[in-house]
Amino acid sequence: MAKKKADRRRAPAAESQDKHPPVRLKIRRQDAPDKPETRRWETFEVEYLPRMNVISALQQIQKHPVTVAGVEVAPVVWDCSCLEEVCGACSMLINGRVRQACSALVDVISPKGKPIVLEPLRKFPLVRDLMVDRSRLFESLKRIRAWIEIDGTHPQGPGPRQSQEQQEELYPLSRCMSCGCCLEACPQYGPHSDFVGAAVISQVRLFNAHPTGALQKSERLEAIMGPGGIADCGKAQNCVEVCPLGIPLVDSIQTVAGETSRRFILSWLLGWSSDGG
């Protein structure tokens, strides 16, 4: 008798799950960057699963790439790796907003079975379908020397210690995953501009604040004062609104802007060269 009551208690939940409509995805596709004539929209339906995200839906399409019209097509191409909002690879436009596909839950972005619209990022060169090439971002990080130089021919011993306050201030900056969301939302960034963007500026702040990284502070400031650097920021503050990790990008821009202003004034007063001081 007790078992029958338990079965009756579970029945409504199972019934409500069965009634959940399939998840419909409308995807912007293109076969190759040099084939704009292949640009098109294709719509798919996949089975709803509890707590599924957009990546889960794309994986279902990959296994069974058939549109709602019953046409079998090539599997949709997208980029991903960690599936836990760490690698930054799965950035795309979801319902018109740039975000990470791995953290976009269907229950949140598709209430009552509303179609989910997926598009590739527009500020980066297209590879295929939802996959883009973020090489420009990585080249910008090289330009500002976004690393700590510790290599050498002999052991250099332990590095300098940081206070707890320094660690708490810098840790949020270190979480940047180079996903490109801030660059996609920035009106100053794109093919029309050389602007490096908020993510790169924030890394200047991070590495200049590190006791060992500060040894290359002058080089980083000179790089970010050059073409496409801090002066090209339009102060729109879209970057901080879309950052999936809540990194204080506007604070970083303000900090680096102050440092570059001081360096410019000192170089003018003291006659420093671009590689000195």
Placement of each model-derived feature along the sequence:
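Short structural boundary motif marking the start of a folded domain
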Residues: 19-25
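Beta-strand-dominated extracellular/periplasmic modules and repeats
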Residues: 24, 41, 64-66
